[in-house]
Amino acid sequence: ASFAEAPPGNPAAGEKIFKTKCAQCHTVDKGAGHKQGPNLNGLFGRQSGTTAGYSYSAANKNMAVNWGYNTLYDYLLNPKKYIPGTKMVFPGLKKPQDRADLIAYLKQSTAA
């Protein structure tokens, strides 16, 4: 199923998901340093593997994914299947509602 078929996302619910499943390795704060994973500020419209100052896997650089609603929706289902060789150890979010909520939060919170 694609993002077009996903339920509407709830940013408040997405923030809770981010805090429990993503914030250990990522931040969304503009100007903040990288953690275990890259800072996600400015995520939408950016190409994978291009955030300055973060050491990406060759897989993330070579995939050259342009991050947006559709690519994030597919990636967050199963990151290691979407980008084989990624350093991200997160197994993914199986529920379409969880992915839609997280993407709604990321769209709001990462606007540069």
Curated annotation (Swiss-Prot):
N-acetylalanine PTM sites in chain numbering: 1
Cited Pfam families: Cytochrom_C
Keyword set, alphabetical order: Acetylation, Electron transport, Heme, Iron, Metal-binding, Methylation, Mitochondrion, Respiratory chain, Transport
Chain positions found as N6,N6,N6-trimethyllysine: 80, 94
A GO-annotated cellular component: mitochondrial intermembrane space
Residues annotated as transmembrane: none
InterPro entries (alphabetical): Cyt_c-like_dom, Cyt_c-like_dom_sf, Cyt_c_1A/1B
Function: Electron carrier protein. The oxidized form of the cytochrome c heme group can accept an electron from the heme group of the cytochrome c1 subunit of cytochrome reductase. Cytochrome c then transfers this electron to the cytochrome oxidase complex, the final protein carrier in the mitochondrial electron-transport chain.
Protein name from the UniProt record: Cytochrome c
